[in-house]
Design a protein with these regions (language model features):
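Extracellular beta-propeller repeat domains
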Residues: 2-420
Length: 420
């Protein structure tokens, strides 16, 4: 798949919209770029190179790590031609990839998973496929390990299809959005198309015994400033409010939204409307993350002072939010900013990848470190096309500070480790 959709989005002057920016962050960022134009000394190791065969190919989602240090991910190609779910385990002989499930496509099964798989409260893996199912509009699925012990490296897991999207009423094509879970184990997500307006929905899957019921919580209509085409997934706060991002909106640059449930129906509130360059970001593709204080963090694929995207924060204060740009990403090649969700470590540092930035336009891995009211940008690694290219997804960190992720290329893609 090519670079993310909606590449051409018009500029807009943010004007009088209230916006808080740490000016020192811009200064520190500029100094970091001038003082250290090359990536910091890191060691990149390729853990697996996909062949496009039974092991899968062209990963677009990031990884999920379990408590034992194993990694789980998806590929939209390979297997039986419809994609796979894989596990990467470290053994005495090194890293070994096992295919947990091979999608079969058609009406009964999904095809083309491009979002992460995540562990639910019950320990099963949950995810979506962008296609397949009855109408080829995608599915929501779960995977469970074998009940009996399996000594083989290739131990297939059991898939259960929780929902098959049927058309425009219940949403179509869940795409890149990460799923989210509440305390009761209910599942929340987005679809890029479908719904009453045909431009996306936020949905919920409620469990009752062994069955699941889908309900559409909100259908985007792009009337006024509400946004359209949610590319990323959603996150939930402790009160059950739902947060996400869309394209479109009053400035046609994207929005951050909140869904609350004050009565019998869900109500949308636009938390922030992006204004586009040079004063703001545009195209918020990645799923938001939330810290323990309820602050939201996200990225934009483009926009900002450099046009290469931004990293931003939204802080709640009563019924309002304060929006701050933490960093305008440097435009080394300006071929595509971040598309995956940010990752925050225990010290509050933020990590992500860009799809096509870096010195050769093949993407990079970066870190943002807070220092008082400013943030320092560090380019950890520039992919050169030989050691990987075009990372779409998020990164994960282990307890030792090693960083793990996937790249779309070269060939059929890779899983990599970046060691300080």
């Amino acid at each position: 798949m090519s670079a993310p959709v909606q590449e051409a989005i018009s500029n807009f002057d943010i004007g009088a919209r209230i916006r808080t920016i740490a000016v020192t962050a811009v200064v520190v960022l500029a100094m970091a770029i001038i003082a250290a134009p090359a990536a910091q000394a890191q060691t990149l190791s390729i853990l697996h190179t996909f062949t496009g065969g039974q092991d899968g190919g062209k990963p677009q989602a990031g990884l999920t790590m379990d408590q034992a240090g194993n990694f789980y991910g998806t590929t939209p190609q390979g297997g039986a031609g419809y994609g796979t779910v894989f596990k990467l385990s470290h053994t005495g002989a090194g890293w070994v990839l096992s295919t947990l499930y091979t999608f079969q496509g058609g009406g009964s099964d999904g095809a083309g998973p491009i979002a992460r798989v995540l562990f639910g409260p019950d320990g099963a893996l949950y995810g979506t496929t962008n296609a397949g199912g009855d109408s080829n509009f995608g599915i929501v699925f779960s995977l469970r390990p074998p009940i009996t012990a399996c000594r083989s490296v290739q131990c297939p897991w059991t898939e259960t299809v929780l929902h098959r999207f049927t058309g425009f009423g219940d949403g179509t094509n869940p795409g890149y959005g990460d799923l989210a879970f509440d305390a009761a184990g209910n599942i929340y997500g987005t679809t890029y198309f479908g719904g009453q307006g045909g431009i996306g929905v936020v949905f919920k899957l409620t469990r009752s015994g062994e069955s699941w019921t889908e309900s559409v919580l909100y259908s985007f209509s792009d009337s006024g400033n509400e946004g359209s085409l949610p590319y990323g997934g959603v996150v939930l706060d402790s009160a059950g409010n739902i947060y996400g991002t869309t394209l479109g909106g009053i400035n046609n640059q994207g929005v951050v939204f909140q869904l609350s449930h004050p009565g019998s129906s869900w109500m949308e509130t636009v938390v922030h409307s992006f204004g586009g360059p040079p004063n703001d970001g545009e195209a918020p593709y990645g799923t938001l993350i939330m810290d323990q204080q309820g602050n939201l963090y996200g990225t934009t694929y483009k926009g900002g002072t450099t046009g290469a995207g931004t990293v931003y924060e939204l802080q709640p204060s009563g019924n309002s939010w304060t929006y701050s740009i933490l960093a305008d990403l440097p435009a080394f090649s300006n071929s595509g900013g971040p598309t995956g969700a940010l990752t925050m470590d225990g010290a509050g540092n933020l990590y992500d990848t860009t799809y096509g930035d870096g010195f050769v336009g093949a993407g990079n891995v970066f870190e943002l470190t807070p220092s008082g009211s400013s943030w320092t940008y560090t380019d950890l690694h520039d992919f050169n096309g030989q050691d990987g290219s075009h990372p779409y997804g998020n990164v994960v960190l282990d307890a030792h500070g090693n960083i793990y992720g996937t790249t779309f290329g070269p060939g059929y893609g890779e899983v990599w480790e970046l060691t300080p």
